[in-house]
Amino acid sequence: MLQALLIFVLQIIYVPILTIRTILLVKNQTRSAAGVGLLEGAIYIVSLGIVFQDLSNWMNIVAYVIGFSTGLLLGGYIENKLAIGYITYQVSLLDRCNELVDELRHSGFGVTVFEGEGINSIRYRLDIVAKRSREKELLEIINKIAPKAFMSSYEIRSFKGGYLTKAMKKRALMKKKDEHAS
């Protein structure tokens, strides 16, 4: 029984680490992923080793499977809380909606406005890049000002230049100034 509990606990530690490592690889953060992979591998070997010692012990196998499933739930929760990376939203509007553009820019979001031809009229598309950690804030602003907007989103693997890069550099400089002032 104690072995089954140990296997379960190891799995709910191992699987979230596996999730984080996978995300780091997808985000092209290979060095961080390799570091996390060391811990992941060690836990995996210990847990699986206990299970393979006695394959007739069904409690250990069940603990492994339930721990894996629970670890997936926990890993998904942790990934959402960490919100690593950036996201782009494309927002389609019937009118230019300067109020929305101004509010997004005032809130620190980079916004590019495009005019295009829809089936019945001119349409406007906003391209908005944001940190994933600010996605909820972004959606609240859009839904408050343009609740009928059509939106689609996708995650960004990498980017270069633009407003967001300038804003990040500016924040880094401000942080250094604050550290030197203290």
Swiss-Prot record:
It is found in: Cell membrane. Keywords: Cell membrane, Membrane, Transmembrane, Transmembrane helix. GO terms for cellular component: plasma membrane. InterPro entries: DUF2179, DUF5698, UPF0316. It is a multi-pass membrane protein. The keyword Metal-binding does not apply. The chain crosses the membrane at residues 6-26, 32-52, 58-78. Belongs to the UPF0316 family. HAMAP family: UPF0316 (MF_01515). This is UPF0316 protein BCG9842_B1857. It comes from Bacillus cereus (strain G9842).
